[in-house]
Amino acid sequence: MSIKASGGSPLARPQLYRTASILTITQAEQQDRFLQLGELNQLVSFLNSGQKRLEVADILTKNANILVARAADKIFVGGSAISYLERPQAAVIIAGDQSSRDKINELSGNIQGDFGQSFRSLFNAGGATPPGFKPINVLRYGTTRMRKSLRDLDWFLRYLTYAIVSGDPNILSVNIRGLRELIDNACSSAAAIVALREMRRTALAIFEEDIKGQDLVREYFNVVISEFEAPSLTDKLRKRESTDLQGLRLPQTYSQAGVSTPRFVMKSSLSADEKNTVVKACYRQIFERDIAKTYDLSLSNLESQVKNGQISIKEFIRSLGTSNIYRKQFYEPFVNSRALELAFRHFLGRGPSSLEEFQKYFAILSATGLSGLVNAILNSAEYADYFGEETVPYFRKLGEEPQECRNWGPQIDLLNYSAPFRKVPQFITLFSDYKQSLPDQHPYGTGNDPLSIQFGAIFPKENKDPRKRQAIFGKDTRRILVRRGPGIYNQISNPQVRPKSAGSLGPKIFKLSNTLVATNSSANFENSVDVIAKVSYLRVFGREVYQEEKLLLRPIESQLQDGQISVREFIRQLAKSSIFRSLYWEPLYICKAIEYIHNRLLGRPTYGRQEINKYFDIAYKEGYYQVVDAIIDSPEYIETFGENVVPYERYTTPAGIALRSLRPGIIDQRFKKVISSKSSRFVELGKVKEIRSSNDIQSRIAQGVTALRDQSVIFDVNQNSSQEVLEQALRAAYRQIFERDLNSFSIGGEFLDIESSFLNKQINVKELIQKLALSELYGKEFYQPYPNTKVIELGTKHILGRAPNNQAEIRFLNQILASKGLSTFVETLVNSSEYDSVYGTNTVPYRRFPTLPAANFPNTETLYNRLTKQNVSVVVPSFKKVLGNQ
């Protein structure tokens, strides 16, 4: 088996401990149900005690030094033990009021004790002294050991506060069980037990007046001491039946820390609700959902048999696996390899372990079909050992039992909820990679990137048609590159031929000199410098530059034309330009960007991880410009291109060469279909019968909209407008309101005050429009001669620049006009939100050519094109009676 191949390494985060809330919620989530009343009561009890738990943890934290000092004085003599407690790891004493200070002083006492005091305190503590305990002399014990011992005592107290806050002693059980054997090898576990008991006694004395706090501290200290005294747990072994399968062991702390997978066992003594829960667990395991709840499907006959004890859970699982529902969901949509992997997930709770096991069950599946595979799995010895006759299969995932390293990635993916959405088999692909030779591919990633156009794709997203493969290359693997030209000129075997041209077999080489050198080309160029610049753009940017971009690059190109810089320096400046950065640096992650830049400037992909890591380190520590300098100032660049040669492609990948060539195997052999001469009926009906002129076509394109829409002039004024602009706006207002230009001769003295106020900037345009519409002349011309409907039309035309929208608007304005008169009608239009949003306070109203609603455009068109004095008919009755316009 290849040592390079692996199943990938998805991130695994085993749960380190449990809390009361996590345990309750996770158990309900695993069973796909809501929280029950008892679980809700547990959460309520935990949340209600939260303030007390935080208070207890805070008091223990404030008195941490005292607790550790008292515990240390109990087991150490001949010196001040607390002085060896390292301050950064010790809890901080935060003294409160005077009473708390007195209590701390009372508890702390004199920590300088002698052997007699320590020995006498053993008999006053209460409880039997552990056998083998002897007080430890500080001087003989040594500084290093004293620091470690005090650190351990402080660690016990800290984890006690963690457990109190979390509401579950699980964090203590996971981390303390097994420490007794470890401490026995270093010093004395009996001394640790004495210290913990003394710490408990002192902590209980702190909460002497708080019964609830005292009970809480006693409960968790008892867990600390009992877990420390208990022997360490043995590892969970996973025995295998075949020599090709791995035997594994798992420390039980992993399974204790996480929330264990619930086991559902069918017993005749269970209640009806409990039996229903077991049946639902079978559905969730086999069909990955509760089909009775999700799809309203149930196998009532089988359910009644298993509940009545006529068939076992094993036979019930067998019936589910051979049912039409399972066949349509997990067998027919997949190839046999993937169907086999999903069957292992559903019936054994794991994935295939080896190629031999896969071949064995694949042969059964191919020969006997789905029913034969299900029977073979359920009749296996492994199924009998783990699940027996009455236990529902469950996922044997990380934390539940030890996992194999050779199928680590596919195993974790298989137990994910999204496993049925992956159609491509994973395990057989992985097992075949173990036995095959290494393919030619990029040293990064999962076999993804042999093409010369996809460098650095080390993290491909598998959103569509996922094909996860293992990363089989290490950091010392060198990539295979093909030389453009004779193979004897390869720089790996012969570095001295780097500057040697490949001749007619290689790419064109452009060199800046008095005459342009173009290998295998007889083209005549007008100016060699212009050609060098153009070729450099194509090489560096991968395309011709745009006109605006060329303006930015013109100073650099001028320096090249004047001979102030060489081609090498010209390439450097192009690579440092903002154009190049926006193409190959800013939108890409660093690894892929370095691949692109390296290929553009040096003419070849990177050889492997070591080379790209060098540039990655430079980019991280020194920045982008130093990466460009490192490539252009490298010995390989100088030896190959020198000062005046434009970089060219020297090496590429084998797949890149195959991509550029047309081979019979990659040419699409599909032929074009013969198009029938008979056209469809809808095409014939859609053909134009008459001959249309260009003017007719243009009018149809315009769809009735004239050029006036684009030629409209909008008059705006502001505080800085000149007198001439104000006069123009005033004349435009006259034409808009009265539909004609009024001069001083015709208006007489009626508008002199209005005109004077506007020209002196005492009123704005909006107020001007309102005063003009409220004038006697407007009432005489557009109100008195017409009915209300026509007045509404003219009012919206003059003030809002459009015809009425619908009958509902006409009805609303008619009520205002009929009940309150013209002045209120004008004020309603001028002060409307539509007027403010379209014209504001400084814009003269104008024709707006509205297109919504659709009927409003022809009405407005008719209203503006009709001569008002010659035609008094109403326009808006063209509205049809449609629901919403009424």
From Swiss-Prot:
Keywords noted in UniProt: Antenna complex, Bile pigment, Chloroplast, Chromophore, Electron transport, Lyase, Membrane, Photosynthesis, Phycobilisome, Plastid, Repeat, Thylakoid, Transport
Q: Which sequence ranges form a coiled-coil region, renumbered to this chain?
A: none
Q: Where does (2R,3E)-phycocyanobilin bind?
A: 187
GO terms for cellular component: chloroplast thylakoid membrane; phycobilisome
Task: Look up keyword Plastid and say if it applies.
Answer: yes
EC number(s) recorded for this UniProt protein: 4.-.-.-
Topology in the lipid bilayer is annotated as: Peripheral membrane protein
Enzyme class, UniProt record, top EC level: lyase
Q: Where in or outside the cell?
A: Plastid, Chloroplast thylakoid membrane
Maturation and modification? Contains one covalently linked bilin chromophore. This protein autochromophorylates (Potential).
What family, per the record? Belongs to the phycobilisome linker protein family.
Q: What does this protein do?
A: This protein is postulated to act both as terminal energy acceptor and as a linker polypeptide that stabilizes the phycobilisome architecture. May have intrinsic bilin lyase activity.
The protein's name in its UniProt record: Phycobiliprotein ApcE
Q: Which organism is it from?
A: Porphyra purpurea (Red seaweed)
Recorded name of the encoding gene: apcE
